[in-house]
Regions:
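Secondary-structure transition/capping motifs at alpha-helix termini
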Residues: 1-2, 35-43, 64-68, 85, ...
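Cys/His-rich short segments
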Residues: 115-169
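Intrinsic disorder at enzyme termini
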Residues: 470-551
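N-terminal catalytic cores of NTP/NDP-binding nucleotidyl/phosphoryl-transfer enzymes
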Residues: 2-75, 94-114, 131, 257, ...
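Helix-rich, typically C-terminal accessory recognition domains appended to large enzymatic cores
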Residues: 120, 327, 332, 340-377, ...
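Structured secondary-structure scaffolds
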Residues: 2-48, 100-104, 148-149, 155-366, ...
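Phosphate-backbone binding interfaces of nucleic-acid-interacting proteins
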Residues: 528-651
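A glycine-rich helix N-cap at a beta->alpha junction
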Residues: 75-89
Length: 651
């Protein structure tokens, strides 16, 4: 029997900088949905990737003194690292710079051109470089800026090719009327209808003022405009034009999940492109809300951009995933707060789930030598628990199918709370004192273990490394793929032997100075510093005597990537690092242990004084030195060449 297929995508993210917690939010949503559909036994294809072309990237690369591909390669390595550490289960990672994608874009462009839907003319108008968007003057905000990002637009005049979007306006309005669920939530649909009814303009789809893009097949001096290029990734990822059987297995897509700021591109431009190509429409485009930080939009200028890798180092990936999915209603803007995260982890994961597992396994070991047995000594309270489980599973499936993820999670946690209450109501510690109640005690223990087994299945899309830990402590073999069909009562085998392990989630303690202590380890919380007033700025260290340029040229500074890091025994200040510099790996000993943990260093790019003579520190030969900044009071901070590849020269 052929399994149903399910195709889900995230936006492909723009590698102008490293990803923040908002990107992690979108991708975690998509991952939980992909895992849920695998849980249902469906054949899932989950695509994410990077949108690498455009004027913005070309300008950034030029500023850094590297080629565009060198610039994006370094950032995309961090994209992939984040998804790996966040346990994102994507089936493919598409890059628009890949040859497979170039062919799809050029073939699509040629097809639409050949049928007369593309024409050439001189374009004169307004362009937002950060958003890669064209605007009419009437569409600008009250300050004459881009209505999406509110940054200044540039006047552009160049020869361009245009896609006849206006030709398809009536078709689009009719399609949306006939398919009201195509754009979700409904508020986004109404916005798009109002936008189109103002009159669709033809879309500029090529550029000649930069060359970092896919060449237009019928006019090589042009490159493809970013959005016409980027949207086609959803076809490239499932082998459009390469493997028809595979493509038709997954197309049309079940869900394009995007941020609300790019709904217009995905619900107006994309379906018109597909219609012009003669392809079916995706089933749904869902525009989720933004993630704000402590009630304020993330911005570098405000110093409130949250690095998800730092959060994962401190709290663990599953805790971050759980908070994002549990705390936020999908269609609305959500608020990220460190305090709310800590409270949610302590209350839901440590207290509710963690304590239920710990109490259950501890009592089974104490009273029955770790063996789970159902004797059939049932009472009405057991039937209530079983009925609640059946109801919870049904409501869970309904909520997830409707993309009401936090509703599904709340339902599972209501079951967990009921199981904790069941312990108090059945009082196993009292049953254990009465030999006549021995069979009843065994059944109570079985019921708790079986509830935990089913809970582990239901939470696997959200906190995927936690479910295997529960199974292991219950003495069960962890399946290659959890299945919803196994979330039925009575599948825990009699005679199973539990195995108590470490707490699932240690409680998080917060110190007076804002640091956290998790599992005995302290993590400093570095709040964003306010801008200093002129009179508050600390005095600068005196500048050393001047040197000549030839003296400076003797220093060879290179970008290195830290592969391994460990503390040097008997030293409070030193870390021993294995650093890749181009094609070689060096041992470097650095006095940064008071400011950086070894785990923070692995995978990090650093600047190395590469031609420094070797020196022995604590008996270890150090072949280089890391470049740091100092505030004059001894505090060190590494110089961070995130966007450069290992071996690059620093000038």
């Amino acid at each position: 029997m052929t399994k149903p297929s399910y195709y889900i995508t995230t936006p492909i993210y723009y590698p102008s900088d490293n990803l923040h917690i908002g990107h992690a939010y979108c991708t975690t949503i998509a991952d939980s949905l992909a895992r849920f559909h695998r849980l249902k036994g469906e054949d899932v294809f989950f695509l994410t990737g990077s949108d690498e072309h455009g004027l913005k990237i070309q300008r950034k690369a030029k500023e850094k003194g590297v080629t565009p591909i060198q610039y994006v390669d370094a950032i995309i390595a961090n994209f992939k690292l984040l998804w790996e550490r966040l346990h994102i289960s994507n089936n493919d990672f598409i890059r628009t710079s890949q040859e497979r994608h170039h062919k799809v874009v050029q073939d699509a462009l040629q097809k639409i051109y050949d049928q007369g839907d593309i024409y050439k003319k001189n374009y004169k108008g307004l362009y937002c470089v950060p958003c890669e968007s064209y605007w009419l003057e009437r569409q600008l905000d009250e300050n004459g800026c881009c209505p999406d990002c509110h940054r200044p637009v540039e006047e552009m005049e160049e020869e361009s090719y245009f896609f006849k979007m206006s030709k398809y306006q009536d078709w689009w309005l009719q399609f949306i009327e006939e398919h009201p669920d195509f754009i979700q939530p409904a508020s986004r649909r109404n916005e798009m209808i109002n936008f189109v009814k103002q009159g669709l303009e033809d879309l500029c789809i090529t550029r000649t003022t930069f060359d970092w893009g896919i060449p237009v097949p019928f006019d090589k001096k042009h490159v493809v405009y970013v959005w016409f290029d980027a949207l086609l990734n959803y076809l490239t990822g499932i082998k459009y034009g390469v493997d028809d059987e595979f493509f038709h297995k997954f197309w049309p897509a079940n869900l394009h999940l995007v941020g609300k700021e790019i709904v217009r591109f995905h619900t107006i431009i994309w379906p018109i492109m597909l219609h012009a190509m003669g392809l079916e429409m995706p089933q749904e485009v869902y525009g989720h809300g933004w993630l704000v930080v402590d009630g304020d939009k993330m911005s570098k200028s405000k110093g409130n951009v949250i690095d998800p890798l730092g959060l994962i180092d401190e709290f663990g990936a599953d805790a971050i995933r759980y908070f994002l999915l549990r705390e936020i209603n999908l269609g609305s803007d959500g608020n990220f707060s460190r305090d709310a995260l800590i409270n949610r982890v302590n209350a839901d994961l440590a207290n509710d789930l963690g304590n239920l597992l710990h109490r259950t396994v501890s009592m089974i070991e104490k009273y029955h030598g770790g063996i789970v047995t159902d004797t059939g000594a049932s009472e009405p309270i057991d039937d209530e628990l079983k009925a609640l489980i059946k109801e919870t599973v049904a409501n869970y499936v309904k909520a997830m199918d409707n993309m009401e993820i936090n509703t599904a999670i709340k339902g599972v946690w209501a079951l967990i709370s009921r199981a904790n209450k069941y312990i108090d109501e059945t009082a196993p510690w009292i049953l254990a004192k009465d030999e006549a109640k021995a069979d009843r005690l065994k059944t109570v223990m079985y019921n708790l273990a079986e509830t935990l087994r089913i809970v582990a299945i239901l939470i696997s899309p959200y906190i995927p490394t936690t479910s295997p830990k529960i199974y292991t402590q219950l003495g069960l073999q962890v399946p290659e793929q959890f299945l919803l069909a196994d979330a039925e009562w009575g599948k825990l085998p009699n005679g199973t032997k539990v195995c108590k392990g470490e707490p699932l989630y240690p409680r998080i303690e917060v110190t007076e100075d804002g640091a956290t202590i998790i599992g005995g380890k302290r993590y400093e919380h570095k709040a964003a510093a306010p801008a200093l007033k002129e009179e508050e700025k600390p005095a600068m260290e005196p500048i050393k005597p001047e040197i000549t340029f030839p003296d400076f040229e003797k220093i060879d500074l290179r970008v290195g990537k830290v592969l391994e890091a460990e503390k040097v025994k008997k030293s409070k200040k030193l870390l021993k690092l294995q650093v890749e510099i181009g094609n070689e790996v060096r041992t470097i000993v650095s006095g940064i242990s008071q400011y950086y943990e070894p785990e923070q260093m692995v995978g990090r790019n650093v600047v190395v004084v590469a031609n420094l003579a070797p020196a022995k520190l604590m008996g270890i030969e150090s072949c280089g030195m890391l470049l740091c900044a100092s505030d004059g009071q001894g505090k060190l901070a590494l110089v961070d060449p995130t966007e450069l590849v290992s071996g690059s020269r620093v000038k």
